[in-house]
Design a protein with these regions (language model features):
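Acidic/histidine-rich catalytic neighborhood of metal-dependent amide-processing enzymes
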Residues: 1-31
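Metal-dependent amide/peptide-bond hydrolase catalytic core
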Residues: 19-23, 30-31, 36-217
Length: 217
């Protein structure tokens, strides 16, 4: 945003993210999958287990929704991207009583998606499923989404191959052009310029005693 305000133009950007799995020179990132988290709450009617007709168990709708979301085949992947994937990361009913039907059931899921989707297209798809199942179960719901980044791809060009050749010349390894992994800071700069990512080996990133090889530096 700062560069946009200054109307600065960048021809190409090389981002120094830790792109290499085991050895320096293995991988150059030419894009990244998008990431979106959904926080879902199903609201039912609390009651006694012995009198289910007087209650509405939100966990019933929640389980049905999560199963359908997990069973969706969002796509088959593409030439540059692996298939999009949804994972349920939290389920919480927060009910301390064994014989009480809860009022609220919560879950969190995360989607890593390729460039066949946008966060908005995925929201529309998921919301239809959630709405349909909640209507069938006569339950209410709340859904909040957080988008960490959209999927993007820098199509290989002469600069890509130049960098690939330089890396091979120095490391004696021809780097693979890849879009695997999580989001990165390249998602910010790609809005104003084509970019690639190449950096150190990421085996210990975010771990205790994080370290890199001096020779790699």
């Amino acid at each position: 945003e700062f560069l946009k305000k200054r109307k600065e133009k960048i021809d190409f950007c090389l981002v120094g993210e830790p792109t290499n799995p085991d050895k320096l020179g293995q991988m150059i990132k030419i894009g990244r999958r998008g990431s979106m988290t959904g926080k879902l709450s199903i609201i039912g009617v609390q009651g006694h287990v012995a009198y289910p007709q007087r209650a509405n168990n939100p966990s019933t709708a929640l389980v049905q929704i999560l199963k359908e979301l997990k069973d969706i085949k969002l796509d088959q992947g593409s030439k540059n991207f692996q298939a999009s994937n949804l994972e349920v990361t939290k389920i919480n009913i927060n009910n301390s009583a064994d014989n009480v039907i809860p009022k609220i059931a919560n879950a969190v899921f995360n989607i890593r998606f390729n460039n066949k989707h946008s966060s908005n297209s995925l929201k529309n798809k998921l919301n239809k499923i959630i709405k349909r199942i909640c209507k069938k179960n006569k339950s209410k719901y709340k859904i909040e989404y957080k988008v960490s980044g959209e999927a993007f791809l820098t199509k290989p060009n002469k600069i890509t191959y130049m960098i690939q050749d330089i890396v091979k010349r120095i490391t004696k390894i021809k780097p693979k052009l890849s879009t695997t992994g999580g989001t990165s800071d390249a998602r910010f700069i790609r809005k104003i310029a084509p970019c690639l990512e190449f950096g150190l080996v990421g085996k210990t990133m975010h771990k205790v005693d994080e370290a890199v090889s001096l020779s790699d530096l």
